[in-house]
């Protein structure tokens, strides 16, 4: 049996051949370059064939392919929804790969499922049966592993963490992405900084924030972290609020699921990884006391590769599970 892991993102698709112990044999990356709909699926199957060719895998050999997508993989319909890929509202990716790659078994999962499986296979949560991966980037999502199994839910939407209710009363601005995401994702941090800066300037208080040097509508989380490092008052207020919310959200996970480990990753947890100790301190104020003492918080050990290794783990763990259940 040969295992393939495919990590599909919004701008590129990466893939690798894996051994059963999740050791990576070889990998390749192809750029989407504006492709949409069926063209993206074609690129995924092309990558599978490139990997199999480079690995000199015979066509008649059995293959298990794990794919992680930037959206929701619907297990009941075998389709996926990826908002950043035009034409992928209910796209039959699984069936297209299975038809294009002979003798293959294909499993498609959301990226947050891949992240937690990657960390449990090779990262800071290696060997854990109960672990949470909180992915903070443009949005916020979570992969949840309990008693050795990833949770999916009725509609495969488990882990839509951005909608956690953390700050009453309700505000209409949270309609599109939720309360938590509006404050503590990359997009949310930029949005809150813009709001604070506008309020400062409208009050006639100019020259008080480093962020004034930027065009307000072009401010991103990168500029906010840059300002934070310069002890900017606007950035400090926004980042401190995000830290509080990361801690509260983690506390909710700890109290609900009693995990061994909570892992923070995603694009934002390069600059934010230094705050993990503060996040744990905040979580300790809110979480069930016994559970939080048994739990450790870590930044991801696979910041740029969790999806790829997780995709390999999707193939390996699902194949082993199905084999054991036969």
Pin down the residues of each PLM region.
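ATP-binding/phosphotransfer module of carbohydrate and carboxylate kinases, centering on a glycine-rich
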Residues: 1-64, 74-77, 97-105, 121-128, ...
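Conserved NAD(P)H cofactor-binding loop of Rossmann-fold oxidoreductase domains
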Residues: 70
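General beta-strand structural signal in soluble alpha/beta enzymes
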Residues: 106-110
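Short acidic loop-to-helix transition motifs that present clustered carboxylates
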Residues: 113-115
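Glycine-rich phosphate-binding loop of actin/hexokinase-like ATP-binding domains
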Residues: 126-184
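Residue-level structural signal for beta-strand termini and adjacent loop
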Residues: 18, 29-30, 85-86, 156-157
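A charged helix-plus-loop insertion that forms the helical arch/lid used to bind
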Residues: 78-89
């Amino acid at each position: 049996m040969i295992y393939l892991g495919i990590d599909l993102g919004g701008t590129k698709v990466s893939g690798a051949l894996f051994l059963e112990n999740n050791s990576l044999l070889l990998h390749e990356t192809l750029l989407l370059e504006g492709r949409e709909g069926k063209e993206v699926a074609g690129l995924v199957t092309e990558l599978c064939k490139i990997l199999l060719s480079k690995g000199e895998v015979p066509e008649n050999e059995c293959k298990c392919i794990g794919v992680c997508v930037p959206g929701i993989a619907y297990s009941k319909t075998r389709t996926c929804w990826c908002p950043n890929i035009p034409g992928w509202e209910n796209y039959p990716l699984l069936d297209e790969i299975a038809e294009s790659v002979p003798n293959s078994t294909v499993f498609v999962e959301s990226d947050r499922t891949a992240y937690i499986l990657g960390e449990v296979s090779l990262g800071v949560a290696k060997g854990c049966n109960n672990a949470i991966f909180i992915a903070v980037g443009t949005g916020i999502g979570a992969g949840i592993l309990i008693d050795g199994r990833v949770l999916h839910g009725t509609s495969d939407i488990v882990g839509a963490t951005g909608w956690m209710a953390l700050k009453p009363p309700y505000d209409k601005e949270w309609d599109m992405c939720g309360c938590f995401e509006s404050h503590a994702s990359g997009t949310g941090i930029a949005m809150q900084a813009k709001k604070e800066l506008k309020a400062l300037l409208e009050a006639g208080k100019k020259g008080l924030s480093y962020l004034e040097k930027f065009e307000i509508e072009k401010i991103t989380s990168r500029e906010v972290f840059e300002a934070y490092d310069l002890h900017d008052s606007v950035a400090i207020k926004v980042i401190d609020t995000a830290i509080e919310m990361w801690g509260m959200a983690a506390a909710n996970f700890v109290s609900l699921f009693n995990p061994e480990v909570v892992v923070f990753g995603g694009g934002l947890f390069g600059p934010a990884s230094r705050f993990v100790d503060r996040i744990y301190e905040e979580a300790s104020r809110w979480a069930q006391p016994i559970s939080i003492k048994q739990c450790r918080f870590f930044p991801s050990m696979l910041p740029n590769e969790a999806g790829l290794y997780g995709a390999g783990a999707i193939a390996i763990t699902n194949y082993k599970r199905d084999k054991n259940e036969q």
